[in-house]
Every structure is written in structure tokens, then in C-alpha cells.
Amino acid sequence: MKYAFIRDELAHVCTVRMACRLLEVSPSGYYRFLKAPVAARKVRRLAVEDAVVRIHAESRRIYGAPKIAHELPRLGVSAHRNTVSRIMQEHGIRAKSARKWRPTTTQSGHGHGASPDLLGRDFAADGPNRKWLCDITYVPTDEGFLYLAGVMDAWSRSIVGWSMSDSLHATVALDALRMAVARRNPPRGVVHHSDRGVQYACRECRDLLKEHGMEQSMSRSGNCYDNAMMESLWATLKKELVHGRRFRTHEEARLAVFEWIEVWYQRTRIHGSLGYVSPEAFEAAARAG
């Protein structure tokens, strides 16, 4: 409702007359709204508060005000993101924030050559299987690090292939790529972009890419932003799954990563860059035309 928006969002930053003119409503109507029974406004506010708390819980306590505000109509209410932000503060809830520290999983001190950067930080794609982004991260456990290799389709942000291992051997990256190929059956010409790590520069990886007609692309040395979309994916995984959680065994971590990728990230988690839908929903909508 426009009157509620004026009261909650505009009245403290401009005059009522100016706010009413901007939203094409009358000041007299606004003042009548303010005199309406307090109970009705309170009921609406409580409904919004309940919806905000519910959506935050359903998102695994991950979503911030913008995504929660976008999801409110699903529960039959609406509110500006600033109102949602205030409600979150009042209830002591907030989105998880990412940590900036990241250990090195790139082993670039090898004798293999490096391929040129074919993307130049341009991750935009006009369809599926144009640009695949690849990288390796780690998940700490009481049994030692578990390494996770992933392949993302830049078009939909879908994780099309992934693999886990207790070592940084090239096998973990190759298995993720094989999963991606099996799932997508891509045409020849896909750009496979990664860092310069030995897992991607080795002969085994180059042969696999050649077998499937893929063009190899690598970030420049020391430029993590050349693969920023994958770096962002790993930061999201760490924020939502790893930080503040202790995995006692490799198996426990494997199961948690599987659930995060295949159930949460792919099918449920909404992405602002995809129009606030999940990767799976984005691809389904594209197929439906």
C-alpha cells in the first residue's frame, strides 16, 4: 500500500506533500490512513514480521533483507526491503556474512604450460554450455582437509559437475569434469576456464578437454578475479555450510556438501542475478520458452 510506504519509508526523508506527489496519492487520504484503527495496521505488521522470520528460517538463516523482501509475496504479504531490514534488527536476525580469508589450493609451481585467458573476466553467456568455470576449494574436518572440485555453467550458475577427495591429485578435477560431461553432453567448443593449477594444466586434463572438443582457458597468474564467479561460489559455500560448523569425518562432510549442492543450491536457493530463482528453475524456464 502506498500510504504505508510513505509512513514507513518516506516520511522521515521528505515532506508528506512531496511523498504523496511522488506516489500520486492525496495528502488528505494519507492522513485518513493514519487515523485508521491501529489494530488493523498492527495485524498487518505482525503478519509481515511472522513472514520475515519464517523466510529467514527457511533459507537456513542465510537470506538478507533484499531476498526476504522478494519472497514475501509468496506468503501473501509485502514490505520494502528497508522495513524488512528493521524487522530483522528488531528480532535479532541477520544474513550470514562471508569471511575474506581463503587458503591456497592452487599448485602452480609445476612444469606444465599455461593456456591463455579466453574470457577476460567476461562471464556472460547467451545459453547453456558456452562457458564452464572450474576451481577447487577445501572443507576442513577432524580427519584432515577434504578437497572439492566444481564445474559451473556460467549461464545459469548451475553446478554441473563436482567431486571430492582427500588429496589435491588431478583426479578430483577430472572426476568433476567427467560428471559435467555426463550430465550435459555438451557440444564441441565449450570454454573450460580455470586457474593455472597443476590439476588443470596436467596432460590428463588437457587430453580430456581435447577428447570432448573443449577450449582451455586459464586465469592470469595471481589474478583471482579472473575466475571471480567460482570464487564467489566457494565463498557462498563456506559462509552457508562450513563456517561455524565442525565436521568430524570426511563422510560427514561429503554428505553435507552433497545436500548443499544438489538439494539446496541447485533446486532451492534463489539468486538475484537469475531473477530471484534457483539455477534449476532458471534452466527450466528457459527450456519452456
Located regions from the model:
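Charged DNA-binding/catalytic regions of mobile-element recombinases
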Residues: 1-289
